[in-house]
Amino acid sequence: MRALAFSGGKDSMACLHLMKDSLDLAIYVDTGKSYPETQRLVEYASTLVRMVIVKTDRDRQNVEQGIPSDVVPVDWTAFGQEVAGKKSVTIQGYLNCCFSNLCEPLTRKAKELGVTEIVYGQRDEEGYKSPSRNGSISDGMVRIHPIEDWTAEEVLAYLSTKMDVPAHYRIKHSSLDCYDCTAFRKDSKDRVDWTKEAHPDLYAEYLARVELLNAALKESLDCTIYTG
């Protein structure tokens, strides 16, 4: 059985159009924090392939493990606070947040469904990507990366022949992911600016979280930098 890991971004959308005739289904993980644009693209994709939606409780996970961050002071983690004492904000590494709320639930559902091949829109030129490559076997499933050697421009050019390309597909993180994500800060400026313009209500939620995170990071640095 062949499934597509669908995020709503341009790369997984390109894989859908490229391989829809050989796909048995697609799997989308709904964290409860997706943009309206992503929700519409999931609905669109559902007209092309059987869509299995996995719901996760990201809010609960963040309450337990913390706000995701690129920089993680140990004493502000859930484990660190057991030793160093309770902090006003709990922080977790972004990889843990993404794995717990997106990657692991998707893999678990794929295995549950009996998927033997799973298609990802991973590309070599991306800054963040799995160490797995096209043909790798992970969790008993063969990973297929049909656009591994494509550029972002090639993806957009291909999609323009298949659909009306959404304007936000020009954003670096075109899958958008969680609208209040406080990680990937260096690469998220275009997403944050776009959110502020297109969805001021969602931007307000993001800003509240990032201000909490910034204050905690500043406090941790003030505690650890020796200025003797």
Q: Where does each model-flagged region fall?
A:
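ATP-dependent adenylation/nucleotidyltransferase module used to activate substrates
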Residues: 1-162
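ATP/NTP-dependent adenylation/nucleotidyl-transfer catalytic domains that generate, transfer
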Residues: 4, 160-228
